[in-house]
Structures are given as structure tokens and as C-alpha cells.
């Protein structure tokens, strides 16, 4: 005679794990949409370098349009009719290829082909981008408007990220921009009519001008502080604080709302 073992209750299969698609990463998105701008100086074996980034800004009739954004002084300081824009192409076998191409920035009379914000160091111009870059252009809605920094409680000490080409250097031979981080160093930030720029605590070098300044969840805020519900572009790096010959290691950022205003001027009727 023997006892029968009672089999254990069947173990329920765990519910399938639902893996959601990763959220779109503005950091990688902006890296893909940021380009080097340069022009060789006519009187020296050097070149003038700046940074630009692409915005997807459809025309009023809905037709697609890719707009290059940079600091006005970057293009204004390039006296020749052509600059170079640093496109990058992914190789089918892997890796990337840096392939700068000419960018017409002045007409035959020497007049600028870009549109300048009337008061801020912001320039925009429509560009014919390669398909991969046109797809990488950042949607216009990701540019912070005049009320965004208040709504998202961005304040002094908060981290923001920026992309650029300091001294003309890139992150690698493929021409990708260098990612850096700084903290908001001024207060108040708004209203932007009274405070059109704000300070960022990080060293600025030639070649950084025109780069995007942005927030993503990877940037640190004070513990317990309000977290914005999605990433955004806060502004454009335009210059540095330099009271004399010695820089202070502090950047000056123009609010992204002025980029919106400059893009709107592309669609304004031509003057008489």
C-alpha cells in the first residue's frame, strides 16, 4: 500500500509582457538634424564654422518644407556666396560618410538669401535637404513658445543640453555634432519681451553658435521638481558672455519663440 502524491496546482502562465515602443528621443533626433556650416576664409588658410539645425516647417498650404536654423552672425560672417553644409550619409555596409555640399547663401548681388529675425541673432532659410535629413528635421511644434518655460517650470539650476562644433571639431569623422550640457544660469527667464535671452553655464567656443539648446528627461532638474511632459527646444546658442578678452564660460541663448517668429517671416508677403 502506498500514498499517492497530490500533484501541485498548475502554475498559471505569467501574462505576456507588453513592450511599448521606445519614446522618440529628442537627443538622438536633434543629433541627426544638426549640421556643420562652414566657409573657407579668402585671406587665410582657415575657415569660419558654425552650427545649424533643421526644422520641419510646412508652408501655409501644407506643402513640406525643411528650414535651416542658425545664428544670424554665422551666415553674416561668411562673405562669399556659398557656404558648405555638412550632410551625412549612412553606408549600406555600415558606418557613415561625411559629405559636405555647397549651400548658396547670397544672391549674385551679394544679398542674403536667409531671413533674419528683426531683433534677435536668429537666421532661417529654406534648404533642399537630402531625403534622410528632411525626415530627420524636427517638427515645428517642438520649439518652445513664449509661455513654455513658465508652463514647464524651467528655472535656474536646471540642466539643458546643446549641440555644436566647437572650434570646428565634430564627434567623429562622420561629422556628427558634439553633445554638451550646462545649467540655466540666469533668472528670471520670462517674460521673453523683457528677457529675450538667458544664460547657460558652460564654456562656448567658436563653432558652437547656432546650435540648439534643448531639454529631455535625461537632463537633471531639482528633486521633486515638475517634469515637462515631453522634450522641447528651448532656444538657440548665439554667443558667450565676454566682458573683455577673457571669456567667463557662460553662453547666451535666444528663446526658441524667436525661431518661430523668424520662420513665420518666410511666409510674410514681400515688401514693396
Place the predicted regions along the sequence by residue:
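Cytochrome P450 catalytic-core helices
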Residues: 70
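A conserved glycine-rich beta-strand in the N-terminal activation segment of trypsin-fold
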Residues: 40-67, 250
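Short consensus segments that form the blades of beta-propeller domains
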Residues: 43, 172-176, 225-227
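C-terminal tail/extension regions appended to the core domain(s) of diverse proteins
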Residues: 2-19, 241-272
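A residue-level detector for short acidic-glycine micro-motifs
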Residues: 54-56, 186-188, 215, 238
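Serine endopeptidase catalytic core focused on the charge-relay Asp
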Residues: 32-35, 39, 48-49, 78-197, ...
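Catalytic nucleophile loop of clan PA
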Residues: 199-236
